[in-house]
Amino acid sequence: MSGLPAPLVASNVSLSLGTQEVLQAVRVTLHAGQWLAIVGPNGAGKSSLLTVLAGLRAPSAGQVLLMGRKVAVWPAAQRAQQLAWLSQQGQAEGDIAAIDVVRLGRMAHHGWLSAPSAADEAAVFAAMQETECSAFAPRRLNQLSGGERQRVLLARVLASSARVLLLDEPSTHLDAPHQRAMLRSVRQRASAGVAVATVLHDINLALLADSILVMARGCVVAQGAPHDAALQAALVAVFDGAFSIERLTVAGQARWAAIPLFNSTAST
């Protein structure tokens, strides 16, 4: 085992917005090579947690450590080399070429006043190929569909080569083939030692992760592997029994799926 600290650790993090406490003593450890899915009903605090983990919002209590140092003390450029964040809203409007958006992912490596290196450009082109957005590289964001914009923004994050990826609803606007491609990118990064956390509303996508963090009302309710019975029970409970979790066999491998439950007495 390596003696290095976990890439990202949140200890007893709380967050208040006005009079509302949106996070309450949350503890999260994101390990290298791990894909963590964060799930919970609307208003559970998932996106708020991600902004605190990214150092974009200071917690009211507790602390977040990035590579063993408080995330808030990292110079912005150095932090961006270590940690990349995809926001839920996407910030995907504007008269800027798609390829220039992806190039922003390399800005922390070469600075505002320096031209990108050959390695920077190679990372940009590789990320755009991976997310299948090379074909519209010169087009403006405001000319792209929602799914195309999302792929550009995901490419920006992947181009950063950061050791920690925080992705808030990365599957938004993506059709099934591009959701699959996104999941493949996440899994490949985790397999290469990157620490990845994704906020997901689709429970079936979350069930593909290494570990699932279940939130409700600003608290962590449970965390565990998808096959863990206690984790599955917590998932069903926080979503008011809207689904059951069933074991499937796909291509000879065990998989878990959330199957919606409908009230059989409801009128048709």
Task: Please place each PLM-identified region on the residue numbering.
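Conserved ABC transporter NBD signature motif
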Residues: 62-70
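Conserved ABC ATPase "signature" region
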Residues: 103, 118-136
